[in-house]
Curated annotation (Swiss-Prot):
Residues where FAD binds: G14, A15, G16, H17, A18, G19
Annotated family: Belongs to the MnmG family.
Keywords, alphabetical: Cytoplasm, FAD, Flavoprotein, NAD, tRNA processing
Cellular component, GO, one term: cytosol
Organism field: Chlamydia trachomatis serovar L2 (strain ATCC VR-902B / DSM 19102 / 434/Bu)
Domain of life according to the entry: Bacteria
Predominant location: cytoplasm
Required cofactor names: FAD
A GO MF label: flavin adenine dinucleotide binding
HAMAP family: MnmG_GidA (MF_00129)
Ligand binding (NAD(+)): 274-288
NCBIfam families: mnmG_gidA
Name listed for the protein in its UniProt record: tRNA uridine 5-carboxymethylaminomethyl modification enzyme MnmG
Known function: NAD-binding protein involved in the addition of a carboxymethylaminomethyl (cmnm) group at the wobble position (U34) of certain tRNAs, forming tRNA-cmnm(5)s(2)U34.
Length: 610
């Protein structure tokens, strides 16, 4: 086997959303990087819905931007509709979402990656890892040659032993139209990695010209919404479009009920577990039998195509049943299908063999990110890619790993969950997963995390200065307004007290007291308003975090023998040995570990220290 004559610092396998972020961040940190993908024309392909962001997910994209990653930038360049979800709810759960042009997303990502110094993009299919039993050495390809590297980042998506299901038919594939990767699964088994099976699916695509939009509800976008942190208001570079909302009918329900046995999911042909919060239409009909109809969202796939994505109609039914189901939906009576819906099963690696840095516990220098870790979603994958790419470089440079905490970021919440919990379904981020979500708002991601991005070399000094200036402005104005007393109603109160009233906005305060309120602009002003309006809750959460941190960050030695601590419950000994947490906080979040177990563990650690 011929070996390529360059020894890379980092080899990234797979150019999906995790792989692109990993390769970009590693190269930006000065590493020599190989990004290996089976097809250069599918880099950053949006395999499912043509959208980025949403509840929890939008928060993650803003955090990626604050750290110096690229998903936010590519989304803003490719966006054809921008919205803020949960606008009527509290600030912690408001989140940006964008419809993107899927072809332009790929084009912008590929063009950007091609311009990064030190990043070599190469077409080739990874077949096996090269290792010496303890450490990764590189990768061999299906084409018959090898690449050597100090570290390897594996971001294989749904390609590891991918199996596509359309009714009773199934066939090998990483996604429709792309071959599966068979060798990597076998190689990971050889190295002792515990593998499981998960399932996801995607709906059919339809021709827009065959749809009756007149019977549907139009869903336009919002103004001044974006993912990249800015000082000025955002104006999209592309023409903006609307989505449309329709619904299933009684006929839809009857068709699915009558043909349920022909579904790959309900016919017993799928062993993998699917995402709870993105169910197929047959799943919804069965589990919510009392509902007569379900919403369907028609989402355009781009400006230069007639294809639309039918959000809410994912299925693994045979194609003839899909045809009838689609035409039973209001407005889709004459719809022309361009691509069928399908389900896909794939292999993933259990989280107990991965450190929060995303390095494997079994083979040194091997990092895993994206759906191989059991997650679902472009945003979760990209965030893991950033962490894996950064820590691969840290490994090469013999620096400590970078792992943001769950108290300061949604990315930290995800890393902690993936490495302490037993996944029984694909992991998706929600704001409800964070204990301190009022501190983790999408508007303050830059103020929370930009110092990390700057110190890692990912965030420019100019952008870091912008975040620092925003933070300073908010702190100074909070302080000034708290000391500025004016008559409001019958009493004289500080202006911070006025802004705490639910009916008073920052803009109203600015209008009513123009001589006393500094105009910070709508973006920074909105953050100031939230900081003041929710200051009581924020203060309580910060106090709680400080009290927890005293025990949260107590380190656990790598060589600890849990089975020798007889006072631990049997379940605790088994699970702590399986997950090998690095801190008391991580140990406490492993399912099945009780408060009593943690107390026993802390006593044991204190004894050993003495």
């Amino acid at each position: 086997m011929w070996t390529f004559p360059v020894d890379y610092d980092v080899i990234v396998i797979g150019a999906g959303h995790a792989g692109c972020e990993a390769a970009y961040c590693a190269a930006k940190m000065g590493a020599s990087v190989l990004l290996l993908t089976s097809n250069l024309d599918t880099i950053a392909k949006l395999s499912c819905n043509p959208a980025v962001g949403g509840i929890g997910k939008g928060h993650i994209v803003r955090e990626i931007d604050a750290l110096g990653g690229i998903m936010a930038e590519i989304t803003d360049l490719s966006g054809i509709q921008f919205r803020i979800l949960n606008q009527t709810k509290g600030p912690a759960v408001r989140a940006p979402r964008a419809q993107v042009d899927k072809q332009l997303y790929h084009i912008h990502m590929k063009r950007l990656l091609e311009q990064v110094p030190g990043l070599h993009i190469m077409q080739g299919t990874a077949e096996a890892l090269l290792d010496n039993g303890e450490k990764v050495l590189g990768v061999s390809t299906k084409e018959g040659w090898a690449y050597l590297g100090k570290t390897v980042v594996l971001s294989s998506g749904t390609f590891m032993r991918g199996l596509i299901h359309i009714g009773t038919q199934n066939f090998s594939g990483g996604r429709l139209g792309d071959a599966a990767s068979l060798g990597l699964s076998e190689d990971l088994k050889r190295l002792g990695f515990p593998l499981g099976r998960l399932k996801t699916g995607t709906p059919a695509r339809l021709l827009a010209s065959s749809i009756d939009f007149s019977v549907m509800e139009e869903q336009p976008g919002d103004h001044n919404v974006c993912f990249v942190h800015r000082n000025e208001m955002f104006v999209p570079t592309l023409p903006q479009v609307s989505c449309h909302i329709t619904h299933t009918t009684d006929q839809t329900k009857d068709l699915i009920t009558k043909n349920l046995h022909r579904s790959a999911l309900y016919g017993g042909r799928i062993e993998g577990v699917g995402p709870r919060y993105c169910p197929s239409i047959e799943d919804k009909i069965v589990k919510f039998a009392d509902k007569d109809r379900h919403h369907i969202f028609i989402e355009p796939e781009g400006l230069n195509t007639q294809e639309v994505y039918v959000n809410g109609l994912s299925t693994s039914m045979p194609f003839d049943v899909q045809y009838d189901i689609i035409r039973s939906v209001s407005g889709l009576e004459n719809a022309i299908i361009t691509r069928p819906a399908y389900a896909i099963e794939y292999d993933y690696v259990h989280g107990n063999v991965i450190f929060p840095s995303l390095e494997s516990k079994l083979i040194e220098g091997l990092f895993l990110c994206g759906q191989i870790n059991g997650t679902t979603g472009y945003e979760e994958a990209a965030a893991q890619g950033l962490i894996a790419g950064v820590n691969a470089v840290n490994k090469v440079l013999r620096r400590p790993p970078f792992v943001p905490s769950r108290q300061e970021s949604y990315i930290g919440v995800m890393l902690d969950d993936l490495t302490t919990q037993v996944l029984d379904e694909p992991y998706r981020m929600f704001t409800s997963r964070a204990e301190h979500r009022l501190l983790l708002r999408q508007d303050n991601a830059g103020m929370r995390l930009s110092h990390y991005g700057h110190s890692l070399g990912l965030l420019s000094s100019e952008r870091y200065a912008m975040f620092q200036e925003q933070k300073a402005c908010i702190e100074q104005e909070k302080e000034r307004l708290s000391k500025t007393f004016r008559k409001y109603g019958d009493t004289v109160v500080p202006l911070t007290r006025v802004l705490c009233r639910p009916e008073v906005s920052y803009q109203q305060l600015l209008t009513e007291f123009p001589a006393d309120v500094r105009d910070l602009g709508p973006i920074v002003g909105a953050s100031l308003e939230m900081e003041i309006k929710y200051s009581g809750y924020i203060s309580r959460q910060q106090t709680l975090i400080r009290s927890m941190e005293r025990s949260e960050n107590i380190s656990i030695p790598e060589d600890i023998d849990y089975h020798s601590i007889s006072a631990l419950s049997l379940e605790a000994r088994e699970k702590l040995s399986k997950f090998t947490p690095r801190t008391i906080g991580s140990a406490a979040r492993i399912s099945g570990i009780s408060v009593a177990d943690i107390q026993v563990l802390m006593v044991s650690l204190k004894k050993d220290a003495h």
